[in-house]
Amino acid sequence: MVVSQKTLIFAPKKGDTIMKTIDQILKIKAVVLYILKAFPEGVDYIHLFKVMYFAQQDQLKEYGLPIIYDTFVARKHGPVPALTYKVLRGIEGKADLSSPELKDFADSLNIAISQDGHQLVLASKNAECDMDELSVADVKMLDKWIEKCKDVESFDLSDKSHEDRAW
């Protein structure tokens, strides 16, 4: 549902309402595509979500500003960025992506199944990260957490995110 030309309503869970601007959605999309560039063979949901979470947490500590305005919600395997998760669920056919911006975000991603049966997120063939959406500080923080997380087992990242008292 479009509230104005720049604001969309998005409900991550029944009863919750979160407003996202088109600019916020474009920034989240840029962050996801930037992370996926580091994982050309795809990345599982946990790795994607934890890079986003830890980079966001570190950015808030260091600069007092978030990288993205995605709401992290508590889930079984730790914090999950609600809008990003909704887009992935939409690709799976399990959530409605009613706005053109969310559909465009979904069109920039693919989901595949790994040999061991895990869902992998990949950038679509022609999808490109809009680097104009990312600051130098954003890129530096994302690079730091991509490097820290890339060789760590998914469930170890999940455990690490549970160490945070916020969850």
PLM region spans:
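Domain-edge interaction signal
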Residues: M1-W167
